[in-house]
């Protein structure tokens, strides 16, 4: 099956799994997805990310995170730049998102990173998604 936007598919799988109160979510693997998932883990939005062999391909098994009342930690996860409408931002235009509670994830010339880190390194790039 051909996907026109695999990152949006990954974000939708996470969103749907959390709404259904699933503990785990399986996502087909790629390097950019791994980078995004590692950032989500680093920022505390997911508990764990493991690589699972699926034949000759790798899948990612994401352990979703919930608060004490069984509400998802990720309140909103949204794709910003799409294949049909790319959104780029300069380092000076990167602002705190949702009073520094939310996170922008950017693809820069120095790799995939959060908006905070990109602002610190003074690099801009493509806004992949925002998470709150």
Swiss-Prot record:
Pfam families: Ribosomal_S8. GO terms for cellular component: ribonucleoprotein complex; ribosome. It comes from the Bacteria. Keywords: Ribonucleoprotein, Ribosomal protein, RNA-binding, rRNA-binding. SUPFAM superfamilies: Ribosomal protein S8. GO terms for molecular function: rRNA binding; structural constituent of ribosome. The keyword Magnesium does not apply. GO terms for biological process: translation. Transmembrane segments: none annotated. Part of the 30S ribosomal subunit. Contacts proteins S5 and S12. One of the primary rRNA binding proteins, it binds directly to 16S rRNA central domain where it helps coordinate assembly of the platform of the 30S subunit. Belongs to the universal ribosomal protein uS8 family. This is Small ribosomal subunit protein uS8. The lineage of its organism: Bacteria, Pseudomonadati, Spirochaetota, Spirochaetia, Leptospirales.
């Amino acid at each position: 099956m051909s996907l026109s936007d695999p990152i949006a598919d990954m974000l939708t799988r996470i969103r749907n799994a959390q709404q259904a109160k699933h503990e785990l979510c399986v996502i087909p693997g790629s390097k950019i997805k791994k980078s995004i998932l590692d950032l989500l883990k680093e920022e505390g939005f997911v508990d764990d990310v493991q690589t699972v062999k699926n034949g000759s391909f790798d899948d990612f098994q994401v352990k979703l995170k919930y608060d004490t009342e069984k509400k998802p930690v990720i309140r909103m996860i949204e794709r910003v730049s799409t294949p049909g409408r790319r959104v780029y931002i300069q380092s000076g235009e990167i602002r705190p998102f949702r009073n520094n509670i939310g996170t922008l994830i950017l693809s820069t010339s120095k790799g995939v990173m959060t908006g905070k880190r990109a602002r610190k390194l003074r690099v801009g790039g493509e806004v992949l998604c925002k998470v709150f």
